[in-house]
């Protein structure tokens, strides 16, 4: 890892080509603490891409599948995913029984569960924001490992973090979505992660881009 930093850097690797994904992951691994991948890469390449990234970087890989189904289906998705990944992201709005189904699988495998409270895009203010605090309370009650809260709205990030006080935060929105890193760093601590994606992987030099952000943290 590069130096000692207060807040951790999570790379959102939303590319769709296996070779490109592994190359960027390798190039940036000195500066990132964790790698988050989602449906675009996994649907394009298969679940084995998780193992390939882990082997090539020695970093944890979190699957951002935002799982949102009934408990029995959530359990199946978690089982398949966590045979490979170090953690999985699920939606909180489906309720505590669906989240608990994922938690049960994760606990048996010693893996992480991260619950979405409020997303970073503008549309999240239409519906999701209205119940974000309730989902943060649920996350706190269930003792999930982490929560997702937006860098694009630092005041909301602060409020949500204060509710789910024992969970670490992964926070998207810095970079391409316009979130201000300095504002976010005033809220987060050494257990938390700033998520940066396009500003790194779309840069002509992803390694330097990752280094630039890491230095600021």
Swiss-Prot record:
Give the reactions, separated by semicolons, that this protein catalyses.
Answer: orotidine 5'-phosphate + H(+) = UMP + CO2
Key word Lyase present: yes
Enumerate the residues binding substrate: 14, 36, 64-73, 120, 172-182, 197-198
Q: What pathway or pathways are given for this protein in its record?
A: Pyrimidine metabolism; UMP biosynthesis via de novo pathway; UMP from orotate: step 2/2
Gene Ontology CC terms:
cytosol
Question: Which EC number(s) does UniProt give?
Answer: 4.1.1.23
The GO molecular function terms of this record are: orotidine-5'-phosphate decarboxylase activity
Q: What class of enzyme is it?
A: lyase
Which keywords does the record carry?
Answer: Decarboxylase, Lyase, Pyrimidine biosynthesis
GO process annotations (BP): 'de novo' pyrimidine nucleobase biosynthetic process; 'de novo' UMP biosynthetic process
Q: Which InterPro entries match?
A: Aldolase_TIM (IPR013785), OMPdecase (IPR014732), OMPdecase_arc (IPR047595), OMPdecase_AS (IPR018089), OMPdeCOase_dom (IPR001754), RibuloseP-bd_barrel (IPR011060)
Which residues participate directly in catalysis?
66
Tell me, how does this one assemble?
A: Homodimer.
Instruction: Please explain the role this protein plays, according to its UniProt record.
Output: Catalyzes the decarboxylation of orotidine 5'-monophosphate (OMP) to uridine 5'-monophosphate (UMP).
Family under the similarity heading: Belongs to the OMP decarboxylase family. Type 1 subfamily.
According to UniProt, the name of this protein is Orotidine 5'-phosphate decarboxylase
**What species was this sequence derived from?**
Methanococcus maripaludis (strain DSM 14266 / JCM 13030 / NBRC 101832 / S2 / LL)
């Amino acid at each position: 890892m590069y130096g000692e930093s207060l807040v951790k850097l999570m790379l959102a690797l939303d590319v769709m080509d296996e070779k490109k994904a592994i190359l960027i992951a390798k190039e940036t691994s000195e500066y990132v603490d964790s790698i988050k991948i989602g449906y675009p890469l996994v649907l394009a390449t298969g679940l084995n891409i998780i193992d390939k990234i882990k082997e090539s970087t020695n970093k944890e890989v979190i699957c951002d599948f935002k799982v949102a189904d009934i408990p029995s289906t959530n359990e199946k998705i978690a089982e398949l995913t966590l045979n490979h990944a170090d953690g999985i992201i699920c939606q909180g709005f489906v309720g505590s029984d669906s989240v608990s189904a994922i938690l049960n699988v994760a606990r048996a495998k010693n893996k992480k569960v991260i619950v979405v409270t409020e997303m970073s895009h503008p549309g999240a203010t239409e519906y999701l924001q209205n119940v974000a605090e309730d989902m943060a309370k649920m996350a706190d009650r269930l003792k999930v490992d982490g929560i997702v809260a937006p860098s694009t709205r630092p005041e909301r990030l602060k409020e949500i973090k204060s509710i789910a006080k024992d969970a670490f935060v992964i926070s998207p929105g810095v970079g391409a979505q316009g979130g201000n890193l300095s504002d976010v760093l005033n809220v987060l601590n050494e257990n938390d992660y700033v998520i940066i994606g396009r500003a790194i992987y779309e840069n002509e030099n992803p390694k330097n881009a990752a280094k630039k952000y890491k230095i600021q943290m």
